[in-house]
Amino acid sequence: MTEAAKTETSLRRTLVGRVVSDKMDKTVTVLIENRVKHPLYGKYVLRSKKYHAHDEANQYKEGDKVEIQETRPLSRTKSWVVSRLVEAARVI
């Protein structure tokens, strides 16, 4: 890998979250949860946001913990791609 290619890929943001929906074709919805400190009260609050991410092979299922990486816009709402599976969902 060239030096320019290493720099270009490292600039992309990566997030780790849980797949909450896999009903769309080649798209999963990933929930990202962050703990932030409230500016006035100091209590830690859980903030969350959902991202649509590209899943080319439809291989990620609901409950999987995945890493997503920012990419060029693929559609109106999809600018992320699933880069790897962190942890598979537990089957009960």
Curated annotation (Swiss-Prot):
Please give an example of a GO cellular component term from this record.
cytosolic small ribosomal subunit
UniProt-listed SUPFAM superfamilies: Nucleic acid-binding proteins (SSF50249)
Presence of the UniProt keyword ATP-binding in the record:
no
Any single Pfam family the record assigns to this protein = Ribosomal_S17
Question: Under the GO molecular function aspect, what terms does this record hold?
Answer: rRNA binding; structural constituent of ribosome
One GO term under biological process is:
translation
* Keywords of this entry: Ribonucleoprotein, Ribosomal protein, RNA-binding, rRNA-binding
Q: How does it assemble?
A: Part of the 30S ribosomal subunit.
Q: Describe the family membership recorded for this protein in Swiss-Prot or TrEMBL.
A: Belongs to the universal ribosomal protein uS17 family.
Q: What's its job?
A: One of the primary rRNA binding proteins, it binds specifically to the 5'-end of 16S ribosomal RNA.
Q: Which HAMAP family match?
A: Ribosomal_uS17_B
Q: What is this protein called?
A: Small ribosomal subunit protein uS17
Q: Which organism is it from?
A: Cupriavidus metallidurans (strain ATCC 43123 / DSM 2839 / NBRC 102507 / CH34)
Give the gene that encodes this protein.
rpsQ
